[in-house]
């Protein structure tokens, strides 16, 4: 272990030394003063502004990058980003984001700057496969605690998905068909194999002030059998093999938008509807007599179908009252996850009987966020006063968990008010302190603070220092779980208090021109996250009494270096990171070691376009190194390990007909990764752990035909 740490330190020192040399050299060269359209961001800003002037370090994945990846949903795109691991659940079909080792409960997911409704609340633990890319303009990522700006759950970071709201053309149309294999399986038949995607986006400028847009997306995943034998199989009573390792899922999404803009006032109304069907096929099929007088037998299986309906309404307005700027969001969101069981006659392919459909997760949200700024009408100093309110009705039935009652119903009203001031001390140096008070009828008042600085070290170089705090409220399971029988005693805890943490980050980026038209941009990052009172399910009485308690301390340390080299039609990006995690766990009389366990990641992307025929080649690579952490097993802590793995995608695109038509083809997951060995999961209080961690369904090939007008 000491040799690994020494090697990692040498790598980081080498990167730092090389970067400093580049920086010294850059001071003697042109600082990219050529005029260009600057990329803008909104996450954490008073108003939309240039990414180089943002006081936060914001990573942007733009529309062209998303298109080049041939991704099918937000999870596919984010999986290419270092230190963001998409965690799939093959049982539920959900995929959530993990940043610096912290799961979906600590990552705030936003669409157009407002949190998205999910199973257990607003913005956290969001299934990213439910976010399509048919009308996405860009994705903004901020790592670190953003509790002042975005409140509960924004401890590891914020992912803000920005949709399209304008067009340069009177009429714009984009339609695409994409067909993919699922590993070696592809079949267009009903209940066939593969993935089938269709989407359409139409935008229309009614006049200089009004714009409207409608988009449609259909994503049908036919499932991946793996070591199982599909829904038609029956008869294995000793070792059931029916079903899928990755269950089938079918999604429909439609979005519509109307936007008005004139002078200093703009507003838009947006509506989004998602329907998802997810099928679970029971591995066990039991013999049933046909009662035909001939001793005939068939096989029945009790299968389950899950259906999700999600509605998102959003109204956004930006205007001025005199010189005071106002930006307000008002949203009503609803998600209802339902299921029904049915008995399926497997050999005859018929449904014998169905049970009524029932809701098992239901969330109903009224949300508003408003911000006032530019009170002093000064370029030197500005401050922002804002509010955020969230009224959530939540419901979870027994299928979602075991609770004190037959179901858990919860109403939460949370109100937050926040204040920050941005002081441009000089043309080169800015500072922004901030504070937030969050009031909840269920928990004690929460206070969060932030302090951000930006120093423009040269014409195209910025050094940012960011400190922030955030909190996380307990979930349904942590508060209300109640699973007690002869063999188990697992209980939630209504007395849990919110988790609290902070992050401290230093970010440096530099850009300059080299000889012969080459341009180089690179950045260095160091980020530390510290979480107190982390909620864990711990043993409180031997041999099998467990309870959720505020017990653990979690620390994460990240060092990263990234570089991008561009010339004409060629670009190369290289990324590296080293992430260390330390967890202080307490379980009865046992305490875990607190040393950091490190994980190395690296990535690269190469893009090249032929000048004359405009054929584009894109290669994406990501390496996730072995990960280690302490796990409790047999009343002692041991090191658990998850093997490393390589991911690579290669895509070729060829435009036709004056760039209106484009044909793309490629291969994803070239190294055919499905699962990796893992000894970090010892199970929970009533289930056994698995020695394999499911990641993907293996190599796939795709073809996409896109029309743009």
Model segments located where?
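Short, acidic, small-residue-rich periplasmic hinge/interaction motif at the N-terminus
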Residues: 27-67, 104
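N-terminal periplasmic accessory domains that precede
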Residues: 39, 74-77, 95-98, 110, ...
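Extracytoplasmic beta-strand/coil segments of soluble accessory domains associated
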Residues: 58, 75-115
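Short acidic/polar hinge/loop motifs at secondary-structure boundaries
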Residues: 115-143
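Flexible loop and strand-edge segments within Gram-negative outer membrane beta-barrel domains
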Residues: 221-255, 259-322, 326, 334-362
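C-terminal beta-signal and adjacent terminal beta-strands/loops
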Residues: 222, 227, 611, 625-630, ...
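Membrane-embedded beta-barrel scaffold of Gram-negative outer-membrane proteins
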Residues: 325-341, 456, 464, 497-555
């Amino acid at each position: 272990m000491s040799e690994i740490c020494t090697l990692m330190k040498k790598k980081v020192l080498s990167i730092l030394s090389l970067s400093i040399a580049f920086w010294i050299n850059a001071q003697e060269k042109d600082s990219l003063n050529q005029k260009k359209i600057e990329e803008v961001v909104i996450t954490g800003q008073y108003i939309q502004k240039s990414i180089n002037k943002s006081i936060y370090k914001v990573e942007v994945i733009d529309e062209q990058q998303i298109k080049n990846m041939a991704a099918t949903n937000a999870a596919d795109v984010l999986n290419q980003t270092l230190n963001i691991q998409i965690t799939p659940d093959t049982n539920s079909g959900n995929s959530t984001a993990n940043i610096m080792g912290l799961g979906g409960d600590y990552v705030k997911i936003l669409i157009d700057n407002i949190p998205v409704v999910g199973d257990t609340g607003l913005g956290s633990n969001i299934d990213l496969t439910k976010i399509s890319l048919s009308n996405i303009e860009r994705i903004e990522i901020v790592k670190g605690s953003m509790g002042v700006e975005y409140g509960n759950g924004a401890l590891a970071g914020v992912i803000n998905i920005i949709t399209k709201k304008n067009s340069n053309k009177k009429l714009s149309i984009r339609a695409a068909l994409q067909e993919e294999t699922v590993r070696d399986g592809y079949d267009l038949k009903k209940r066939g194999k593969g993935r089938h995607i269709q989407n359409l986006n139409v935008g229309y400028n009614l006049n200089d002030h009004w714009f409207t847009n409608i988009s449609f997306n259909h994503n049908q995943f036919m499932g991946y059998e793996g070591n199982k034998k599909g829904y038609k199989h029956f008869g294995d009573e000793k070792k059931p093999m029916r079903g899928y390792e990755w269950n089938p899922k079918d999604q429909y999404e439609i979005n519509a938008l109307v936007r008005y803009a004139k002078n200093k006032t703009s507003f838009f109304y947006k509506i989004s509807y998602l329907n998802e069907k997810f099928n679970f096929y029971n591995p066990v099929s039991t013999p049933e007599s046909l009662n035909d007088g001939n001793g005939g037998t068939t096989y029945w299986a009790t299968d389950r179908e899950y259906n999700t309906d999600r509605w998102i309404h959003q109204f956004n307005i930006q205007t001025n009252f005199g010189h005071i700027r106002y930006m307000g969001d008002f949203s009503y969101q609803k998600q209802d996850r339902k299921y029904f069981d049915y008995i399926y006659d497997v050999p005859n392919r018929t449904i014998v009987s169905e049970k009524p459909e029932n809701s098992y997760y239901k969330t109903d949200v009224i949300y508003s966020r408003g911000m006032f700024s530019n009170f002093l009408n000064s370029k030197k100093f500005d401050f922002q006063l804002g509010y955020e309110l969230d009224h959530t009705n939540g419901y979870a039935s027994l299928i979602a968990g075991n609770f004190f009652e037959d179901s858990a119903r919860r109403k939460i009203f949370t109100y937050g008010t926040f204040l920050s001031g941005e002081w441009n001390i000089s043309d080169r140096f800015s500072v922004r302190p901030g504070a937030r008070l969050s009031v909840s009828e269920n928990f004690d008042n929460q206070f969060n603070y932030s302090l951000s600085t930006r120093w423009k070290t040269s014409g195209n170089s910025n050094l940012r220092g960011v400190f922030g705090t955030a909190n996380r409220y307990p979930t349904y399971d942590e508060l209300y779980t109640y699973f007690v029988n002869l063999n188990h005693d697992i209980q939630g805890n209504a007395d849990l208090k919110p988790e609290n943490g902070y992050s401290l980050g230093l970010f440096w980026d530099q850009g300059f021109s080299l000889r012969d038209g080459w341009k180089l941009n690179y950045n260095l990052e160091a980020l530390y996250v510290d979480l107190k009172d982390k909620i864990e399910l711990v043993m409180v009485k031997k041999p099998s009494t467990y309870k959720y308690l505020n017990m653990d301390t979690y620390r994460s340390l990240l060092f990263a270096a990234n570089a991008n080299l561009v010339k004409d039609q060629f670009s190369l990006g290289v990324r590296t990171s080293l992430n260390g995690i330390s967890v202080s766990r307490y379980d009865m009389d046992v305490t875990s070691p607190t040393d950091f366990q490190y994980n190395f990641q690296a990535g690269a992307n190469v893009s090249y376009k032929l000048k004359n025929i405009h054929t584009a080649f894109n290669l994406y690579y990501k390496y996730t190194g072995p990960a280690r952490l302490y796990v409790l097993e047999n009343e002692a802590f041991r090191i658990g390990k998850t093997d490393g793995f390589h991911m690579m995608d290669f895509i070729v695109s060829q435009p036709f007909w004056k760039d209106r038509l484009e044909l793309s083809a490629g291969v994803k997951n070239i190294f055919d990764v499905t699962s990796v060995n893992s000894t970090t999961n010892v199970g929970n209080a009533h289930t056994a752990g698995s020695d394999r961690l499911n990641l993907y369904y293996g190599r796939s090939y795709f073809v996409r035909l896109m029309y743009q007008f």
